[in-house]
Every structure is written in structure tokens, then in C-alpha cells.
Amino acid sequence: MERLVQRMYCLGMRDPPPANIMAQQEPNGDFPYLPSGAAEVNRMIKENSDLFSDSQCKVCSAVLISESQKLAHYQSKKHASKVRRYMSIHGSEEPIAKRFKPSGDDQSNVDEKDKYKACSVCNMTFSSPVVAQSHYQGKVHSKNLRMQSIGSQTPALPQPEAQAKKDDGMQGPAEQDPNRFCSICQASFNNPLMAQQHYSGKKHKKHMNKQKLMETFGPSTAPASTVKGYPCTVCNIELNSVEQYQAHISGSKHKNHAKPKKGPNAFAPPPDNYQPDYQYPTNEDCLEDPAEWDSFNVAYE
């Protein structure tokens, strides 16, 4: 270094050499300096392990995935510039190890900084806060976060007594809550979000339409365990959808089966309250005065 200074003075330069030149020429001096070669890079990492490692540079928020990338990063001018800026802001009077050991009051701030370096939910690391912010606002993080919350709310196994009540047909408090159980589809939910997704889905709407049709046209005579579609007991067939069922009951084939049969065995006696369209009058109705009816009988004899 003395030779460099003497040479610069010989060239007429009265001012001291620039700081970056001193940094490059003094690898054994004060930090920061720009290392040259793998040995100096490893030495710098070892002496400043709180800031640098073989896989990460905390000053630049850079993740290093290979040996060549590590050497290229730590020997770059961009890295040296950020280190000088970091040291000018934080100062060098306080030991590095002490600066990076958070106290109890600063633990929340450290956690806030750590979330911009890695995401424990998605098991990812970030090279900068901008990349981290983009990840936290993305669909992948939202999906993994939702799946983690669902997994943490997994219900416990039912007790034997509760299971016996369920087998007897008695509904518990959870089965009476629509956010926990759908009595129409016999489906249970872990949280209100799953319930909302179920109620807006096609399967639930299909069962709702089926229930309305059964209430309108009457229940099926077939066992409930074998009924998977929309049965017509008149024609003894089963339809797959609401549209097919409505088209069937509006068709001529169904109406022909629904009409009363004609033939010798098709006659049925009238009901007790049957009233004919025309009633024949009696004798009393024809002759209002009974004396007139007696005179009519004498004249006839």
C-alpha cells in the first residue's frame, strides 16, 4: 500500500487513494473489502457469518444455489456497493453479531423481516422483498394457507355414545347447524367456507330440485336406498335428471299410462256421494196436490 501511495504522489496526486481501491488492495484490513478468489471469499464469509453464508447473502437478500454463483456474487461490485451502503447506515462501531441478535422488544420486527426472506407455509425462499410480496399476494400462497387452516380444524373422531345417537336417528347440535352439516345431501363440513362452496355447487342444487319434485308429484314407492334418480311410479321407470323427468311427465306416453283403462273390467262402482247430471221426477213432483192424484186414479179405474 505504501508503494501505491508513493507512486500516486509521484504522478502528482496529492489526495489519498479512493476507498474502493483501498478496499481491493487491503483484504486483511477493515471490512468491507472486495475479495479476490475463492480463498478470500470463504475467509470473508467465515469472519462475517452473521451477514454471509455459502447459500445466502443477507445484505443483498440473495439466494446462492451453486459455488460459482457464490463466488460471482461476493466478488461483484454490486455486492460491495450494497455492503458499503449497509455499513454506512448501521455503522461499524457495534459488533455485527450483537446487531443481528434481536432483543425481546425487537422480535416482532425480526419476524416481519424474516417473512420477506422465506415462506414457511409454501417452503420457499425469496431474493428480495418485492418477490416475497408478489408471492404472498398470489394464488399458490392463498391456496396453501387455506389448506393449512382446514387441516388444523380437522374434527375429532366421534365418541361411541354420540355415534349411537346418530344411528338411532337423533341429530346432534352439529347436524342442526347448516355450516357444519347438510341434511339434504348428508354432507358434513369442517368450516363455513366449505359449507358455502357446497351450497353453491351443482350436487346440492340437484338434490334440492329432486326434493321439490318429490314434494310436488309425490314420493316414490321404491326403497330410498335404491333410488338414485327421479322415478316415475306410473310408468315404472327412472329418469337421470330434472329435465328428463319434466319432459317425461309432459309426454304422451306418461299421459296414456295415467288415463283410466277401458274394457270389460274397467268399470268401477260410483262413489257414495255420486250425483247424476239428470234426476227423473217422482209422482209427487208431477202432481203437487195429492187430491188431484187420487182423482186421477179413480178416473183411470
Swiss-Prot record:
SMART domains xref list: ZnF_C2H2, ZnF_U1
Record keyword Zinc present: yes
InterPro entries: Matrin/U1-like-C_Znf_C2H2, ZN346_ZMAT4, Znf_C2H2_sf, Znf_C2H2_type
Matrin-type zinc finger span: 55-85, 117-141, 180-210, 230-257
UniProt xrefs under Pfam families: zf-met
Single annotated GO MF: zinc ion binding
Keywords tagged on the record: Cytoplasm, Metal-binding, Nucleus, Repeat, RNA-binding, Zinc, Zinc-finger
Region (Disordered): 151-177, 250-283
Domain remark text: The zinc-finger domains are required for binding to dsRNA, and also for nuclear localization.
Compositional bias annotation for Basic residues: 251-262
Claim: Cytoplasm is one of the keywords in the record: yes
The protein's name: Zinc finger protein 346
Gene Ontology CC annotations of this record: cytoplasm; nucleus
Function: Binds preferentially to dsRNA, but also to RNA-DNA hybrids.
Subcellular location: Nucleus; Cytoplasm
Disulfide bonds: none
Main location: nucleus
